[in-house]
Structure formats: structure tokens, C-alpha cells
UniProtKB/Swiss-Prot annotation:
Belongs to the sphingomyelin synthase family. The keyword Lipid metabolism applies. The keyword Transmembrane applies. Keywords: Kinase, Lipid metabolism, Membrane, Sphingolipid metabolism, Transferase, Transmembrane, Transmembrane helix. This is Phosphatidylethanolamine:ceramide ethanolaminephosphotransferase. Bidirectional lipid ethanolaminephosphotransferase capable of converting phosphatidylethanolamine (PE) and ceramide to ethanolamine-phosphorylceramide (EPC) and diacylglycerol (DAG) and vice versa. Direction is dependent on the relative concentrations of DAG and ceramide as phosphoethanolamine acceptors. Does not function strictly as a SM synthase. Essential for viability of the pathogenic bloodstream stage of this human protozoan parasite and, consequently, can be considered as potential drug target. It is found in: Membrane. Coiled coil: none annotated. One of its GO terms (cellular component) is membrane. It holds the Pfam family PAP2_C.
């Protein structure tokens, strides 16, 4: 058995491991990790689908939310619309955060080849931060994306394990006669490419993936949306709560699936936190060993401008003084 080098137990080794990776490297590598986790989740969905209790034998569990809220199966499509709206709003917010970053570093506003009155100003103007401005604006868009994607990857990975461990009877009408998966490879690819919309899986109950993304958008706008416009917080809060209602009222998930997902998402997003170095160093350990997708050292600034270090010796200084 090979003996680990002594340097691994020294302080210098762990200091190197705790040295933050460039933000650009984190963006690329954590996105790659998220794609890998999406494939893991797709496989877990297939396993859960096969392990789901027979609906003809096992009836849905008693649920207080089902007793209080009237059943409207079509509302699950409305929940998807809520998620789609929040996806668009989050992309818009991230772009506005990028404009705030450009304003912070002294770059001008971007310009379109053809100026469209009103439209160009709405999309390309800098909306100066008025709330939650204690957050440093430099690289705020990059750090916000790292925080969002790492939180999402962690939640999907834990969901892949939790929903396989315990199989619950599905309360959804579509899963009372669950469809058979004919082509497993095609199903996995469709699940990843369409974020689950291109395939039907049953039994993936604990916990709700739709609730995870709704709550992630809620937390994203609660922290960063307020930096763009004050109205984003109340709007996203109302949309997210309505989305929770749609999930339970459509009977696609038990109430516990939604409540647990809300708690875990909020706790994970807070634990990851906002840091000028990006993700916590413990998470960076998982991507530090990747042989591709960015450098491990900060040889350039995060704005992409090379840092030039000039060292003058004594003879050069004397020569310049004489000239």
C-alpha cells in the first residue's frame, strides 16, 4: 500500500487546498458538476419509478394538506408556469447584477448596434442598488451564480438518495397507472435536457424538486433581487407561495414533500453563503482535482485583465535617474 507523502499532513498542504480557485473556474466546474448530478438524478428517478408501491394495493397516505385544499389536477401545469416565470426573472436579475459589476469596475453601459428607445434603456441601463447594498458589487453576478448552482447541485444530489431509500405511494392521478419506461437511455437524456418535463416518473416524492427550484428563486431574489429593484422580493414571494399551493392542490406531492424541500433549500442556500472567494473551500475541494475547465491559480484578475508585476533592480533605477 502506498504511503501518502508527508506534505499531505503539513500545514502548507492544507493551506494550498484552502486557497480559493478563480471565480471563473468555479463557475465552469460547478456547472459541470451540476450536469453530472442531473444525470445521477435521472437514474435515481428511474429506480424510484420501478420501486413505487403498486397503486392498486397501496393507497395514498393521509395528508392534512389534501384534506384542507380542494383537488385541482391541472394546477401542476400552473406550477410549471410559475417556475418558468421565475427562471426568466432570475436571468434578468443576473444580467442586471452583471451591469452593477461593470458599473463598480468603471466600465460603461453596453450598447446595442441599433438603439431602440425605451427598450435599450430598460435592459442595458444600470439600476443602482438601493437595498441590500452592503454586498460588494464587484463580481456579484458571478458569486450569485456560484451560490445558486452549488446549492441546487447539493439539493438534487441529496434528493437522489432520499427518494430512492424510501418508496411512498403516489397520490397523483397520472401515477395510478404508471407508464412503463421502454428506453432507459433515452429517458435519462430527456430527463436531463428537459429538467424532467420530457418524461413522466412516479414515486419521486420526498422531497419535491419543483419546490426546491421555487425556493431557490425565492432566496436568490430575496438576497440579490432586492439589489436590482425593491419590487422583486414581494413579487417572487407571492409567486413562490402560489406555486407551493399548486403543487399540493394538484396532488403531485404530499404536503411534507413541500415543507421539507422548503426547509432544506433555505438552510442550504444560507449555509453556502455569499463570499468574495465564491463557494466554501470545502466544496471547492471537490472541483479542485478536475483536469479541465479553468486554471487553479489566480494568474489574472476576475475581470480578465492580466496583472503585470514589474521588478526594478538598483542599476535600472540609477540609469533612469541619470536619463
Amino acid at each position: 500500500m502506498a504511503v501518502p507523502p508527508v506534505e499531505m499532513y503539513s500545514g502548507s498542504f492544507w493551506n494550498r487546498m484552502r486557497k480559493p480557485l478563480p471565480l471563473r473556474t468555479q463557475v465552469i466546474r460547478f456547472t459541470v458538476v451540476f450536469v453530472i448530478v442531473s444525470f445521477i438524478l435521472a437514474v435515481a428517478l428511474q429506480i424510484t419509478h420501478e420501486r413505487m408501491p403498486d397503486p392498486k394495493v397501496t393507497k395514498p397516505l393521509p395528508d392534512l394538506g389534501f384534506e384542507v385544499l380542494h383537488k385541482y389536477p391541472f394546477l401542476f401545469s400552473v406550477a410549471d408556469c410559475c417556475i418558468g416565470f421565475l427562471n426568466i426573472l432570475s436571468v434578468f436579475t443576473a444580467f442586471k447584477l452583471y451591469l452593477l459589476h461593470r458599473h463598480c469596475v468603471g466600465s460603461g453601459e453596453p450598447e446595442l448596434p441599433c438603439n431602440i428607445p425605451g427598450v435599450s434603456r430598460f435592459f442595458l441601463s444600470v439600476w443602482l442598488c438601493k437595498e441590500n447594498c452592503r454586498i460588494e458589487l464587484r463580481n456579484v453576478h458571478t458569486i450569485a451564480w456560484i451560490r445558486f448552482i452549488t446549492s441546487y447541485a447539493l439539493l438534487l444530489l441529496s434528493r437522489s438518495v432520499i427518494m430512492v431509500v424510501t418508496s411512498l405511494p403516489n397520490p397523483d392521478d397520472l401515477c395510478q397507472d404508471p407508464p412503463k419506461i421502454e428506453n432507459r437511455v433515452k429517458d435519462v437524456i430527456l430527463t436531463v435536457l428537459t429538467a424532467g418535463a420530457g418524461s413522466i416518473h412516479c414515486g419521486d416524492l420526498m422531497y419535491s424538486g419543483h419546490t426546491v427550484i421555487l425556493t431557490l428563486h425565492l432566496m436568490f431574489h430575496w438576497i440579490y433581487g432586492a439589489m436590482v429593484h425593491w419590487s422583486f422580493r414581494p413579487v417572487v414571494t407571492v409567486v413562490a407561495i402560489f406555486g407551493y399551493y399548486c403543487i399540493v392542490a394538484s396532488r403531485f406531492h404530499y404536503t411534507d414533500d413541500v415543507l421539507v424541500a422548503i426547509y432544506l433549500t433555505i438552510a442550504t442556500f444560507i449555509a453556502v453563503g455569499h463570499n468574495a472567494d465564491g463557494a466554501p473551500w470545502q466544496l471547492q475541494l471537490f472541483i479542485r482535482w478536475l483536469p479541465c475547465c479553468g486554471a487553479n491559480s489566480r494568474e489574472v484578475t476576475e475581470d480578465g485583465v492580466p496583472v503585470a508585476i514589474v521588478i526594478k533592480n538598483e542599476e535600472m533605477m540609477n540609469f533612469e535617474g541619470k536619463s
